[in-house]
């Protein structure tokens, strides 16, 4: 996979993600399922979900790879998108793997992620990470990503 574009800012993360989903030909009720770490990935998942809120898809959050714990992602007035009630079903047309899954010390293995992806052979696979996490963890070659959004949060400036 080669880098095609270099964008910046939050819109540089969200616009290509939304464009990809629009081009994927998803219909009403098709699921975009985000797999990520509770707490750290969740805010980014809700931000991605907000960017695509006008598409006719269902959005689902799966903590780590525990599909039995899947939660729906729904709009909340004057807030944005929020992880909410149990999802009821997990049947992704698009799997979104968050980079937190590839970080050292996370209680999920690459093999467990590979198994959940393999359980949905018809699903497209998108990766969203920061600071080249998929490349550093060797996931770029291990997963058949259709799109990777790799953003940088560097430098971080603190003003006091």
Protein language model regions, located:
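Glycine-rich, aromatic-bearing surface loops/beta-hairpins
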Residues: 85-90, 94, 98-160
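Secondary-structure boundary elements
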Residues: 23-28, 55, 118-122
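N-terminal interaction modules that seed assembly of large macromolecular complexes
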Residues: 28-53
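Short N-terminal or domain-adjacent regulatory/targeting segments
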Residues: 1-29
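Short, charged/polar "capping" segments at the starts of alpha-helices
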Residues: 41-42, 69-70, 132-137
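Short, glycine-rich nucleotide/cofactor-binding loops
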Residues: 6-13, 36-41, 101-104
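Long, charge-dense
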Residues: 44-104
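Short glycine-rich or small-residue beta-strand-to-loop segments that form or flank ligand, phosphate
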Residues: 30-38, 62-63, 94-101, 126-127
């Amino acid at each position: 996979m080669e880098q095609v574009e270099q964008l910046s800012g939050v819109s540089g993360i969200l616009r290509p993600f939304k464009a990809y989903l629009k081009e994927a030909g998803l219909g009403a009720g098709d699921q975009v399922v985000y797999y990520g770490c509770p707490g750290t990935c969740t805010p980014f998942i809700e931000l991605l979900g907000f960017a695509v809120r006008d598409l006719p898809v269902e959005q689902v959050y799966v903590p780590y790879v525990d599909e039995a714990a899947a939660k729906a992602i729904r709009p909340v007035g004057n807030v944005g998108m929020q992880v909410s009630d149990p999802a009821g079903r997990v049947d992704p047309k698009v799997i979104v793997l968050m980079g937190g899954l590839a970080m050292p010390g996370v209680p999920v293995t690459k093999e467990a992620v590979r198994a959940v992806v393999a359980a949905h052979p018809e699903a497209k696979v998108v990766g969203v990470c920061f600071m080249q996490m998929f490349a550093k963890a060797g996931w770029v070659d291990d997963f058949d990503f259709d799109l990777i959004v790799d953003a940088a949060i560097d430098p971080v400036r603190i003003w006091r």
